[in-house]
Amino acid sequence: SLTKAERTIIGSMWTKISSQADTIGTETLERLFASYPQAKTYFPHFDLNPGSAQLRAHGSKVLAAVGEAVKSIDNVSAALAKLSELHAYVLRVDPVNFKFLSHCLLVTLASHFPADLTAEAHAAWDKFLTIVSGVLTEKYR
């Protein structure tokens, strides 16, 4: 679980991130599809060209879910229960993709907030996103 210091770091950075959530979400997905093209198979109906309306809309949804997890940092499992079920039972997303997405989000955060993403903040976000990924894959077990 996260320490109090880690929760503080995540909460304070989220304030900055949330004001750019759409851009960050879109860039995160663009990175995901560029770096891990196999992830595109889950979006056969999407226009996956950089900056497309569908990519922007889904990027916004992804960051909104991260925001829900931040708001419910002590109970991420409850906050993301419906998403967990959707991705496991309906969409059947390979769990490794959540790790890839987390990595791409960290890279995007580093590019947007280089001064904020200190080693300590990077570690806190990595730990938090590992928790989020764990929640999103818990229905697979």
UniProtKB/Swiss-Prot annotation:
Residues 1-141 form the Globin domain. The modification Phosphoserine is found at S52, S72. One of its GO terms (molecular function) is heme binding. Belongs to the globin family. One of its GO terms (biological process) is hydrogen peroxide catabolic process. It comes from the Eukaryota. Gene3D superfamilies: Globins. Heme b binds at H58, H87. The keyword Acetylation applies. InterPro entries: Globin, Globin-like_sf, Globin/Proto, Hemoglobin_a-typ, Hemoglobin_oxygen_transport, Hemoglobin_zeta. Pfam families: Globin. The modification N-acetylserine is found at S1. It comes from Sus scrofa (Pig). This is Hemoglobin subunit zeta. The zeta chain is an alpha-type chain of mammalian embryonic hemoglobin. Heterotetramer of two zeta chains and two epsilon chains. One of its GO terms (cellular component) is hemoglobin complex.
